C-alpha cells in the first residue's frame, strides 16, 4: 500500500491536528475516518458518503436529540407551558434555524465554491470556539439570505 500525498490528505492531517489540539473529537474522528478511507480501498465508498452522509448524520443527530424524551430524562411540557414566552421564542427560533438550514443545503448544492469557506469557518469555530459541526448548513442558509438566493 502506498500513501497518496496530495492536498486532500494534507488538509485532513491538518484537521486531525486541529482536532487533537483543540480537544475536539468530532473533527479528529471525522477527519481520521476520511483520511483512512482516502488512503485505502475504502475510498470507493466516499461518493456514497458524499451523497448520503448529510442525511444519515441529520438522522443520527435527530435521534440523539429525541432520545432524552423517549428515555424520560426530559419530560414533555404540559400544554400551559407552551404558552409562555420562552417556549414560544424557542419554537420560533427552531423554525428559523430549520428554514436557514434548508436554504443552506440549496446554496451549497448550487454554488459549491462557498462550501470551502463555510467548511473552513466551521472547522475554526469547532476547533477554537467549542462549536459543533452543524454550522455549515446554518451558515450557508444565512449566506443564502444575504445573497438573496
Swiss-Prot record:
One of its GO terms (cellular component) is plasma membrane. It is found in: Cell membrane. Keywords: Cell membrane, Membrane, Transmembrane, Transmembrane helix. InterPro entries: UPF0756_TM. It is a multi-pass membrane protein. Pfam families: DUF441. The chain crosses the membrane at residues 10-32, 56-76, 82-102, 126-146. It comes from the Bacteria. The keyword Coiled coil does not apply. Its main location: membrane. HAMAP family: UPF0756 (MF_01874). Belongs to the UPF0756 family. This is UPF0756 membrane protein MS1439. It comes from Mannheimia succiniciproducens (strain KCTC 0769BP / MBEL55E). The lineage of its organism: Bacteria, Pseudomonadati, Pseudomonadota, Gammaproteobacteria, Pasteurellales.
Amino acid at each position: 500500500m502506498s500513501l497518496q500525498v496530495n492536498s486532500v490528505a494534507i488538509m485532513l492531517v491538518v484537521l486531525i491536528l486541529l482536532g487533537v489540539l483543540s480537544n475536539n473529537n468530532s473533527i479528529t474522528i471525522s477527519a481520521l475516518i476520511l483520511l483512512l478511507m482516502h488512503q485505502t480501498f475504502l475510498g470507493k465508498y466516499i461518493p456514497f458518503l458524499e451523497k448520503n452522509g448529510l442525511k444519515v448524520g441529520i438522522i443520527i443527530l435527530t435521534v440523539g436529540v429525541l432520545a432524552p424524551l423517549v428515555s424520560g430524562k426530559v419530560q414533555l411540557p404540559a400544554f400551559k407551558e407552551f404558552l409562555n414566552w420562552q417556549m414560544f421564542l424557542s419554537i420560533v427560533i427552531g423554525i428559523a434555524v430549520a428554514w436557514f438550514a434548508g436554504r443552506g443545503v440549496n446554496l451549497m448544492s448550487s454554488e459549491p465554491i462557498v462550501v470551502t469557506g463555510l467548511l473552513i469557518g466551521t472547522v475554526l469555530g469547532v476547533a477554537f470556539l467549542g462549536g459543533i459541526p452543524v454550522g455549515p448548513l446554518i451558515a450557508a442558509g444565512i449566506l443564502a439570505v444575504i445573497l438573496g438566493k
